[in-house]
């Protein structure tokens, strides 16, 4: 985390454990200061940290899950030349339409009314950037080497699901919101694994 090169840290097998460690360290500092959350949520990898902080599993289990998640996603990333970009200053409908003009570009994160993250093939991403500019928007390449949150990660998601099924989980000790639905986690350990 602290001594790796930028290239090494761009590899998700390294990035994810580093981010998880930083998130959990920040949580522990807040806890030491007596700050307690009424509820928790995390986006993408952050949901694993939020689940660990909420007591769904212990820190060591969370770290093992993150290591495996990063490795699975790295394997998929190495199969394709993919990337991501943040598209700014265009409405979601325009971004969806532009992505639809390409065979393997996907609007994946709707971060705000005019900030949508797109994942897909790097060759198509470059063409999308030109199309976005013609529409009056801006595409900012993200410093990642994979198309996260897209169909390019389906095998990794299936592998991670198997990992989750083998882990002992508990009900959250505080309200924990799922990033897929925005709803509190279910009151069922079996459903938490989903």
What positions do the PLM features span?
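Hydrophobic side chains within alpha-helical segments
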Residues: 19, 26, 47-50, 72, ...
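Alpha/beta catalytic cores of group-transfer enzymes, especially the acyltransferase/condensing modules
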Residues: 4-5, 16, 54-194
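Conserved functional loop/turn residues at catalytic and ligand-binding sites
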Residues: 34, 44, 168
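Alpha-helix C-terminal capping segments
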Residues: 29-33, 51-57
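Gly/Ala-rich beta-loop-alpha elbow adjacent to hydrolase catalytic centers
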Residues: 23, 38, 42-46, 50, ...
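Helix-rich "cap/lid" substructures immediately adjacent to catalytic or cofactor-binding pockets
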Residues: 1-41, 118
